[in-house]
Amino acid sequence: MSSTAGRGLDARRDAAWLSMAEISAVGLALIGQVLLTSALAETTYGRWILLLDVFIAAFLVLDLGLPTLLARDGPTHPSALRPAVWRVWRIQATVAVPVALIVGAAVLSRHPDVPALVLIAALVSLLHLATYAPRAALRAAGEARLEAWSKVVERSVMTGGYALFMMQGEADVLPYALVLAAGAAAGWLCSAGLLHRTLGPDQVEPS
């Protein structure tokens, strides 16, 4: 990373960006849930949320505190941010993929009629897990505003997709589940892309 990549840390500025993003993201999430509950039958909605909660709970500790360490140590070692993100991803994948397979098999044994929903719920949780590291790195690089935008992009894709399907009268849960996965993917790609742009092209991906 070049010495000019990123910006200096400013707690007040970063807190303002993150606060605005959180308020926007929570607002969009609430709108999304209202749309979802309006579009789906109560039992269908309940089962989808249950599947999501199972994987979210299983992955809750799988960030292993690594993004937190990245956000803490990154400002003092900015040239190590990109290699650190790749290391975090490799470590998380090593732990998360086996857990996803085990939890997925257990959930499928209880809900064998919805394999697609189980797969999507696992994918959404994995994508959210993968987003933590680049967002922490953006904050460490002094770009909390870009971290904030990545969150808003994720929620905007989700809420916009929900609204589109609701206006079309869609009552099946699968399209809404795919929209949630698309939002999670957008958040991950956006945060990773913004980090790459912030750090510049002069770092080489570690082998």
Annotate each language-model stretch with its function.
Residues 10-67:
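Signature of the first transmembrane helix
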Residues 73, 127-150:
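Membrane-interface junctions at transmembrane-helix termini in multi-pass inner-membrane proteins
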Residues 115-122, 149-199:
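Hydrophobic alpha-helical transmembrane segments
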Residues 8-31, 89, 118-122, 145-149, ...:
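Hydrophobic faces of transmembrane alpha-helices in multi-pass small-molecule transporters and flippases
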Residues 57, 61, 94-101, 105, ...:
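Alpha-helical transmembrane segments of multi-pass membrane proteins
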Residues 47, 79-91:
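Membrane-interface alpha-helices at helix entry/exit sites of multi-pass transporters
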Residues 22, 26, 53-56, 96, ...:
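Residue-level recognition of pore/gate-forming positions within transmembrane alpha-helices
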Residues 62-78:
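Helix-loop junctions and terminal segments of transmembrane helices
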